């Protein structure tokens, strides 16, 4: 075979593999058992912020359909953005028909080693536990229950539009909060490319934030993202213009399914 034709075939096959990987739809997980409580009040105002770094949940698009995860689920922040479907089971406080609700992981429920894991230390490892907002809890059970047994499973996150990137940092340090992630909802690795640079690997800072120690001001920025769960990779080209600045959020056209 002609060498030029051979190389062209390899390029086409690589592009087909990339498209197939990025377009695959996340199928979720089987049902498992856990427990759930809630924190905050009816407004969910006490649940703004959190360990994932999303800030105001309304501004970042998550609202009050959110949950804090015990360390068994939080996975050092790599679970940030994952979506879970929960329903109350085997409790007189469950609503009739055991309706389900979907929540996004936005915070960590820290261990309380001063209490037993079956008596107040609900988030002590290795216990699998969800600490929901009160509005989310009231979708599935009477809030007076305090704690309920639940069935849960991972589901695909259904998002409108592309992944959003909130920028912080300075001229030599770019910190990016990744939000509105569809499909598996999570990120394992990221890389950034300026219009005058090659790909620069970013390190996991905390929660849903990634950082690069490089001077990128005055360059349009693209991102390469790989899901923690599926290992699928997508590219968000020209996600931010050359005029980008810290404190602003930019929405790309790319997302996981």
UniProtKB/Swiss-Prot annotation:
Residues in Expansin-like EG45 domain copies: 49-162
Keyword Cell wall biogenesis/degradation set for record: yes
Q: Which domain of life is it from?
A: Eukaryota
Keyword annotations for this protein, in alphabetical order, are:
Cell wall, Cell wall biogenesis/degradation, Membrane, Secreted, Signal
Cystine pairs annotated here are: none
Leader sequence segment: 1-24
Enumerate the spans annotated as Expansin-like CBD domain. 172-252
Q: Which GO terms describe its cellular component?
A: extracellular region; membrane
Function text = Causes loosening and extension of plant cell walls by disrupting non-covalent bonding between cellulose microfibrils and matrix glucans. No enzymatic activity has been found.
Protein name, UniProt field: Expansin-A18
Organism, as annotated: Arabidopsis thaliana (Mouse-ear cress)
């Amino acid at each position: 075979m002609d060498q030029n034709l051979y190389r062209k075939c390899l390029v086409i096959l690589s592009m087909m593999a990339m498209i197939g990987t990025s377009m695959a739809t996340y199928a979720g997980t089987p049902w498992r058992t856990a427990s759930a409580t809630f924190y905050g009040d009816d407004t969910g105002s006490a649940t703004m912020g959190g360990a994932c770094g999303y800030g105001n949940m309304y501004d970042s698009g998550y609202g009050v359909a959110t949950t804090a995860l015990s360390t068994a689920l939080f996975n050092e922040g790599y679970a940030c953005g994952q979506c879970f479907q929960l329903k109350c089971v085997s409790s007189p406080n469950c609503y009739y028909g055991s309706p389900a609700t979907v929540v996004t992981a936005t915070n960590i429920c820290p261990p309380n080693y001063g209490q037993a894991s079956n008596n107040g230390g609900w988030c002590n490892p290795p216990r699998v536990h969800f600490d929901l907002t009160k509005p989310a809890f009231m979708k599935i059970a009477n809030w007076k229950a305090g704690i309920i047994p639940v069935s849960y499973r991972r589901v695909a996150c259904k998002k409108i539009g592309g992944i959003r990137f909130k920028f912080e940092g300075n001229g030599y340090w770019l910190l990016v909060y990744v939000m509105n992630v569809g499909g598996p909802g999570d990120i394992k690795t990221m890389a950034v490319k300026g219009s005058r640079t090659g790909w620069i690997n970013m390190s996991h800072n905390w929660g849903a934030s990634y950082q690069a120690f490089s001077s990128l001001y005055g360059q349009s920025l693209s991102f390469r993202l790989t899901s923690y769960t599926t290992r699928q990779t997508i590219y968000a080209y020209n996600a931010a213009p050359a005029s980008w600045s810290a404190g602003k959020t930019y929405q790309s056209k790319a997302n996981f399914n």
